[in-house]
Amino acid sequence: MALWGGRFESGASSMFKQVNDSLPFDQVMASQDIQGSISWSRALQKAGVLTADEQAQLEGALSELKAQADAGELDFNASSEEDIHSFVEAALIEKLGDIGRKLHTGRSRNDQVATDFRLWVREHIASLRADVLGVIKSLLNAASRHQEAIIPGYTHLQRAQPIHFAHWCLAYVEMLKRDLSRLDDLKVRMNQCPLGSGALAGTTFPVDRHAIAEELGFDSPCLNSLDAVSDRDFVLELLFVASTSMMHLSRLAEDMIFYNSGEAGFLQLGDSVTSGSSLMPQKKNPDALELMRGKCGRVFGALQALLVTMKGLPLAYNKDMQEDKEGAIDTVNQWHICLCIASEVLDSLQLNEERCRVAAAQGFSNATELADYLVGKGVPFRTGHDIAGRVVLQAIDKGCAIEDLPLSDLQAISDKIEDDVYPVLQLEYGVNQRNILGGTSKETVTKALYQELENLDKQG
C-alpha cells in the first residue's frame, strides 16, 4: 500500500522500487515505529482527532504488532510495502479499516522516521555500552591474571622501556572508558523527540509534543521542525563513536597480533578464536584479531559515506537521507561483533611471562635508568643522556648488556658512575621507580587496577 499516489497516473517501476524501497533494511526499526505510533495515537485522541474507542482499537492492534515484531514473527519478505511505516499502516488498515487510515493524521514519514531512528539509536547505545564494559572487564581480568608480568614497552615498534603487562591492559581500559563517555554524551544530545514536526513545518493539530516526548523517554521535543526532520547529526555521532572505538580495538588487535607472532612469542591465543591453514598444518592464525582490525575500515567507510551524503543537502528532508540507515545498522552490528570477540580473545590469552621478561630486559631498555642515575649524581640530564648513549655503544661493541659491562669500562666513560649503578640497571628497579600517578610501577598499577575493578562494579 503506497502512502502516496493520488496525483500519480501510474505506479512505480520495478527498477524504481529497487532503489526506493527501504523495508529490506528499515524493518529492524519495526518495534520503534510501532512504539512511536502508539504514542501518536494517544496524542491524537487528546487533541480530539480520535475518539477514545478509535484510539483503543489502534493501540490494541499496534500492541499486537509490536509483540510480533519483538518476537521476530512479522513476515517482511512476503510484503511489497515500501518501508516499515507503510508496512505497519497497511497491517492496521487490513485489521481496522478506516480507523487505521486515521493514524497518520498530522504526521509525516519525515518526523516519523527521525523518531524511529532516534529510538533505535538510543536502544543500541545501552547494548553497546554493555559490550564496551565487557571488553573492559576482560582487560581487567587479564591484568589480574598476570599482575606481576613485565613486558617490553615500545615506541616506533622498538623496545623502549619495560612496563607491567597490567599497565598495557589499563591503557586500553582508558581508551574504552572514553568510548563509554562518548556514548553517554551522544545520548544526551540526541535524546530529543522529532514527532509532531510534520514534513517540515509542524502540524496544524494541537498535539502535546512535550507529552509525546516524555512518553517515549525523550528529555524534550526538538525545538525546530525544519531541523528535527533533517538532522542526522546523531547518526554521524554514532558512526564517529563507533569509528573511534573500532580504531581502539584495531590497535588492540595489532598489539596482540604482534605479541602472538613467532618473532615475539609473548602470548598464546585460545583455539576458539584462531584458525588454521588449508595448506600448512602447523599454522595457528589470529584470524579473529585480523578481522577485528579489518572491519575497522568498513566502519570508517560508513562514517565517511554519510558525511559526504549530508554535506550538500538543503533544508529540510531529502530522500538522500534514506542512505543513513544501512551504514549505521551495519556499523552497529560490526561494532557489537568486534567488541564481543575482543572479550573472547582477551579471556583466552595466556601470557608467556618468562619470555616477556627476557625480552623486556633486552635492547638496552635500562639506558634511561642510567641517565637518571647520573642526574642523581649531579650530572645535567642532557649530559647524562649523552653518557648513557656512549655506554650503549660500548655494550654494542662488546656484545653484552649494559649491566654486564665491568665498572672500569663504565668509569672510563664517566667517573660519576660508581658501583651502586648495578642495582639501578636491574629490570624491576626501572619499572618500580616509576611510582607516579599514571606510571608503570607495581604499586601504581596495582592501585589503578583495583580502582578500575571498583569502577566496573559500580557500572553494574
UniProtKB/Swiss-Prot annotation:
* EC id: 4.3.2.1
Q: Which domain of life is it from?
A: Bacteria
Q: Which UniProt keywords apply?
A: Amino-acid biosynthesis, Arginine biosynthesis, Cytoplasm, Lyase
Q: Quote the catalytic activity from the record.
A: 2-(N(omega)-L-arginino)succinate = fumarate + L-arginine
Q: Cross-referenced InterPro entries, in alphabetical order? A: Arg_succ_lyase_C, Argininosuccinate_lyase, Fumarase/histidase_N, Fumarate_lyase_CS, Fumarate_lyase_fam, Fumarate_lyase_N, L-Aspartase-like
Which Gene Ontology molecular-function terms are recorded? argininosuccinate lyase activity
Q: Which PROSITE patterns does the record associate with it? A: FUMARATE_LYASES
- Listed name of the protein: Argininosuccinate lyase
UniProt source species: Alteromonas mediterranea (strain DSM 17117 / CIP 110805 / LMG 28347 / Deep ecotype)
